[in-house]
Amino acid sequence: MRRPLCVFCAGTLGLELVCAFLPQTGRFVPFAAFFIAGLLWALAGRLRKSPAWGYGICLILGAVLGLVLTGSTQAKWEKLQNAYDGRSVLLEAEVESTTSSYFPGRVRAVLRVETVDREAASLRVECASLPTCSPGDRVKGRFALETPDDTSRLNALADGIALNAAYEKGFALLGQSTSFRARTARLQKRLSAALRQGMASGPAGVLAAMVTGDRTHLSKELRTAYRGAGLSHVLVVSGMHVSILCGDVLGRLLPNRKKRLCGYTGRRVRALFSAVLALLLVGVTGFTPSVLRAAGAVWLSALGVWVYGPPDALTSLGVAGVLMTAGNSCAVCDVGFQLSFAAVVGTLAGGAVVRRSQEAWEKQRAKKKHPRLRFWKRKVLGLAGSLWETVCISACASMATFPVLVLRGMSTSLYALVSGAAVLWLVEPILLTGLGAALLGLVPALAPAQRVCSCCAEFLAEVLDRWALWVSGWPGAQIWFDTAYAAVVCLLLAGLCWLAFRNRVRLRVALPALLLTAGLAVFTGNALSRDVVRVELVGSRNAPAVVISRNESAVILFRGGDVTRCAVETTLERRNIRTVECLIDLRLRPQSAQRMGAEQRIAVDRMALYATRRVRCGPAEVEVLRTRNGCVARIHAAGQTFVTLSGSAALAAPVQADTLLASPARPDCVKYDAILSLSSDYRWMPEALSSGQLCHSFSREE
């Protein structure tokens, strides 16, 4: 039996994933009972004498471990949320990471809490708006803690964030932390500054993101361009970057004589160096899931070298995943975690396909007894082999990550394979020259050498930028699928793969058939999603925004703060919305002006009492009525009438609507047939109404 540990880890991760997603549908218990009963019946009745019996036992034992880890994680989250939800507390915390906010002098931050009301505590919280601070700083202030909304709860728990923290008052900097994470965060800042000095803003932001993981200097235009070109994974320090740095740096630094060390000493030294470098990369890049997974594989490989264990990529991958989810089983739901593992599995599959195809070609050539090839023919064949390897691995990695992207509601690019074959080879020289420029920039005496590395890295990054900007302008650069349709397509492709494997269909027949099927599915999905109007509630349950979208345009009815604003921008990004035709600010007392870009703006707080504004945009027609203590917005879209309220509104006659877009405001002045809501806990809702009867989105073809 091969790879029993890998099968054990697959059982653990699979059950953690099932436990995280299925409870939301209310079908977890019957599904689990059916799964375990069916598995035991199949193993006991049909596979007792085959090697699959051992695999089944490993799978069940792994599932038991996954159940234990899931139970301990859920108990930990419930304990924290029951203790602090709804409280205003004094926190002392270390700033783990920051991103830009929408207001001057403010940042969005993730905090690791050290004390709550001067009592020791250990938890992570996210603050949407905090006075300016930097990663590695220790801060103090009074915050209001609350549980994340249902729509963002799973993503927050996957990041290890138990509660949201709203800053109230008393902010103070307590100095710099001395933890390993804080020290590496300051090192990241120094390396990023040394790397970017003397460069243009575009290449500098890309290099800082690729080499040090600092994405704060990356423009929104380049982010969108790389996503459209299918190269967004290049801008995140991932397993590919760790493999290049940990696998190639030592080989380039050691002289040839050292590379030929006899015995096991040389391999142990390299393994130790790679493990230390991987640890440093994990700290510098902020403990991202993809880097943690790759570093875990490097550490396990190094351990295998020291204990004379044979390396196995799949086993290392599985063990790294279990170790990453040991303290937080919800981490398996992180998109970065899933994309990283899917990409590695696809890369390994592509490598196996390349290896088998090369072996088959060599056997065929040996049978024909061809004479020795000339020099130029050998070079041409070597170039063709390298191109085939790049295309095959890129194709397998793209096919492996495609289900994750579409099932998680993210857009994907049709040109990921083209970009991978054309410019992915630039990543290694960019990383090596960028790393050289960053390290040399820390020593002022080495400024000339740093400038040489900097110019080379800047030139290569500029080439990559121009390619991304060019490809992102092609039609179909970003496409988005409905989740249900994406699930059907993924099941169809998985079934075809299984049939091809079972019937031993040749690769040159199976691969084009799969690509043709995937292409037809993409074309059909794109055609079906054209001219479909979607009405969604996003953001905080206390102040949700309304997003009405069709194709690449949208209308936004905004209310709330930074949390809602971030959710709106995430939704626009996932839906590939490029034009906001109208932005209606429903806030009656806004603390600041709304800064999101839009062709037309309406601010309710500037309207006269009982005045009405009507606007007709692409996806919808919106009518807004200002009252003394609130406003009413009526939306006509896709043959339906929607109404949403902000504040309190008293009308002479009730407003008729097909659907109420719910908020904490009491809808006494609205008659409706259905509800779209982010919460089932609003005070005005009937007690018999459960969360299973609610949804937060509506879609219909116009």
Positions of PLM-derived features:
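OB-fold single-stranded nucleic acid-binding module
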Residues: 97-178
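Hydrophobic core segments of transmembrane alpha-helices in multi-pass, intramembrane catalytic enzymes
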Residues: 7, 33-34, 274, 278, ...
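Membrane-interface helix caps and helix-loop-helix hairpins in membrane proteins
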Residues: 21-25, 282-291, 306-311, 327-337, ...
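Core dinuclear metal-dependent hydrolase active-site scaffold
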Residues: 203, 215, 325-333, 469-504, ...
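Alpha-helical transmembrane segments of multipass membrane proteins
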Residues: 17, 276-283, 299-306, 322-330, ...
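Membrane-interface segments at or immediately adjacent to transmembrane helices
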Residues: 72-129, 142, 526-595, 601-603, ...
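Aromatic-rich juxtamembrane segments at the membrane interface
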Residues: 162-297, 303
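Transmembrane helix-bundle segments that form internal channels/tunnels in multi-pass membrane proteins
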Residues: 1-79, 88-92, 253-261, 265, ...
